[in-house]
């Protein structure tokens, strides 16, 4: 079964908690804190695999979880990191965030990977919080939660050439003639119910050809499942319109207009792609009678054309030469991606420091600062030592000054991470609300 759309849930592993421990050894009378850090949670990674050709597996399993990090241990032992979860999808899969609609990745090559959910960092053990004035810290950080999200997967076949035509135009026969594909072929319409891919090997180039199931009028509205298939030609370099010269109901002239209309109504950009017209079944007597009339029409269209018989192999090499020409032109025009430059730009972007801000939503003030929010969520702020550590951090980070500038009153509440505080102007500090 060919399935090209799926919705899945992914959850990265939570980070392990930091450990609260102290050295208790026979010859170490004043053993200090020795709590190890928690391990990092595993990431969820999606990887393109050329051996897959459908998203069918995701209709049976929709929820995916990476391994959580182990908790830290005594003697400064770090917890083991959680294993990454690698989910394999066909080459040509697009990944969208369901909530935002954002395109996260377009996996167009074998082995290409993207992290779709990052594992949480492990919490620091109490050994990190020892100072000259706090020699026995009885607190540690909790591990961060791993990211979670719903994803929408959409497979768009990666083909250089797309074969288009009305039902029974002979596309499957043509594909089997020019490539290694073995599609189902029968003398009745709608034999092809899913897209078929074939590989064409020429002397100095190899390219892929997709046989798109027969389109009918209204395909852009998903009549005859047309909308399901039209999107598979969006990546192609050239479109080949396979028209049946022997069709009396939809002769080539009418069939061509139907196909163009459906492409335009689905996406006008599709008509900007190079086109080739292949007039098929010229081996039939009724088709041969119409060749002069069809050729006169083709000359006025100004589109490269070939009269062929996919069944008998007539003029197939001429058609392949045209396909090859457009595929080569497309591949030569693809710009070279400056990967190193992109990586450097990404590094510079990551260096930008987030500026804390505080906003009011209804009666509640909310601090927007990932670092401070993250620290609050990692600590048990009902632990006096942990709360004192957090307050000192908030002062160093400039959060208290920010609250002063916002002119927040003593009775107003401030949300930082998962905790709610009240500002004490007398002490210029924060008080945790129980």
UniProtKB/Swiss-Prot annotation:
OCT domain mapped to chain residues: 347-425
Top-tier EC class: hydrolase
Cytoplasm among keywords: yes
Gene Ontology MF terms in the entry: GTP binding; GTPase activity; magnesium ion binding
Subcellular location: Cytoplasm
GO BP field: ribosome biogenesis
Pfam families listed in its UniProt record: DUF1967 (PF09269), GTP1_OBG (PF01018), MMR_HSR1 (PF01926)
Binding site for GTP: 165-172, 190-194, 211-214, 280-283, 309-311
Quaternary organization: Monomer.
Name the record gives this protein: GTPase Obg
Taxon lineage: Bacteria, Pseudomonadati, Dictyoglomota, Dictyoglomia, Dictyoglomales
Gene field: obg
């Amino acid at each position: 079964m060919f399935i090209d759309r799926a919705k899945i849930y992914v959850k990265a592993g939570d980070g392990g908690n930091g450990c609260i421990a102290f050295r208790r050894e026979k010859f170490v009378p004043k053993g200090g804190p020795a709590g190890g850090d928690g391990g990092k949670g595993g990431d969820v990674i999606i990887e393109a695999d050329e051996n897959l050709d459908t998203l069918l597996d995701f209709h049976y399993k929709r929820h995916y979880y990476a391994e959580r990090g182990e908790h830290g241990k005594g003697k400064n032992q770090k917890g083991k990191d959680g294993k990454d979860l690698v989910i394999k999808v066909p080459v040509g899969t697009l990944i969208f965030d369901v909530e935002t609609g954002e395109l996260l990745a377009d996996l167009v090559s074998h082995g290409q990977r993207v992290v779709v959910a990052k594992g949480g960092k492990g919490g620091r053990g109490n050994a990190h919080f020892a100072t000259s004035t706090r020699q026995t810290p009885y607190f540690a950080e909790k591990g961060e939660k791993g990211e979670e999200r719903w994803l929408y997967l959409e497979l768009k076949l990666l083909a250089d050439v797309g074969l288009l035509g009305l039902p029974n135009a002979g596309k499957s026969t043509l594909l089997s003639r020019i490539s290694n594909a073995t599609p189902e072929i029968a003398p009745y319409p709608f034999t092809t119910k899913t897209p078929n891919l074939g590989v064409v090997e020429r002397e100095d180039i190899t390219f892929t050809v997709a046989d798109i199931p027969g389109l009918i009028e209204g395909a852009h509205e998903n009549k005859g499942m047309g909308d399901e298939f039209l999107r598979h030609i969006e990546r192609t370099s050239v479109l080949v319109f396979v028209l049946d010269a022997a069709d009396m109901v939809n002769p080539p002239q009418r069939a061509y207009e139907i196909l163009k209309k459906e492409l335009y109504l689905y996406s006008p950009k599709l008509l900007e792609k190079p086109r080739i017209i292949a007039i098929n079944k010229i081996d039939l007597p009724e088709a041969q009678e119409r060749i002069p009339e069809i050729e006169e029409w083709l000359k006025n269209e100004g589109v490269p054309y070939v009269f062929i018989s996919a069944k008998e192999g007539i003029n197939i090499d001429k058609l392949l030469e045209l396909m090859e020409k457009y595929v080569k032109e497309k591949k030569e025009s693809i710009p070279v991606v400056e990967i190193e430059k992109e990586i450097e730009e990404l590094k510079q972007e990551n260096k930008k420091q987030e500026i804390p801000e505080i906003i009011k939503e209804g009666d509640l003030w909310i601090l927007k600062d990932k670092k401070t929010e993250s620290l609050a969520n990692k600590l048990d702020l009902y632990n006096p030592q942990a709360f004192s550590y957090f307050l000192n951090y908030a002062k160093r980070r400039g959060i208290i000054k920010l609250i002063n500038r916002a002119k927040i009153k003593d009775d107003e509440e401030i949300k930082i991470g998962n905790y709610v505080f009240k500002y004490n102007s007398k002490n210029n500090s924060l008080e945790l609300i129980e």
